[in-house]
Amino acid sequence: MNENLKDIAIIERIKTGDKSAYRDLVHRHKDFAFTVAYRILNHREEAEEAAQDAFMQAFVALKNFNQTAKFTTWFYRIVFNAALCAKRRQKPTETITENHALAYSVMDTTQNLQKKERFAQIQRALIQLSPDDVTMITLFYLKEHSLDEIAEITAISSETIKVKLHRARKRLAEVLRVQLGAEVKNLY
């Protein structure tokens, strides 16, 4: 059974009053909901709260879900909007996130250290980008959504997504170029 059909089956169980079905749906999508929210908010607790808000909004809106559509696209649009709303309310703060802690942790091997350093550099670069740029990069590269899927999630045309993604890549490359200096000759 493909993933969307599994989601549809769970939704049908929810609509019939099966309380465990909602738990199953949350379990299936909580990691990605958190990831999308975290990429926009860059704050663990606020991302968790935005993801929870999105699940609550989705639960209320399930009766309006068009089962011919892909559930994940519909749901991640809700997560995206919940995170953007939280971002508007967010106060600028400097916190030590898991990613910062990860960058300072002791690594077992040189290879792991290099991998963690690259990850931390990319995280630091992403922090400097706009939430829109981070969303485009996250959805396309990390979550491997197609341009059409991103267009559905964000309610923006796929041509505009292509342009936004191109510009986001350029801005990320420029931030990395500044961060890494002589280590990087040509990122883009």
Question: Which stretches of residues belong to each language-model region?
Answer:
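Structural recognition of an alpha-helix C-terminal capping motif at a helix-to-coil junction
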Residues: 35, 49-56, 69-81
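Acidic, proline/glycine-rich intrinsically disordered inter-domain spacer in sigma factors
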Residues: 100-127
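Short helix-capping/turn signature of helix-turn-helix
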Residues: 28-31, 39-40, 138-145
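Short, charged helix-capping/linker segments at alpha-helix termini
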Residues: 15-23, 35-53, 158, 178-183, ...
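DNA-recognition helix of helix-turn-helix
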Residues: 84, 133, 142, 148, ...
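C-terminal edge and immediately downstream basic/flexible tail or linker adjoining helix-turn-helix-like DNA-binding
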Residues: 2-3, 13, 121-127, 152-155, ...
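Sigma70-family region 2
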Residues: 15-16, 42-43, 53-70, 89-91
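Arg/Lys-rich amphipathic alpha helix in sigma70-family domain 2
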Residues: 63-67, 77-97, 115
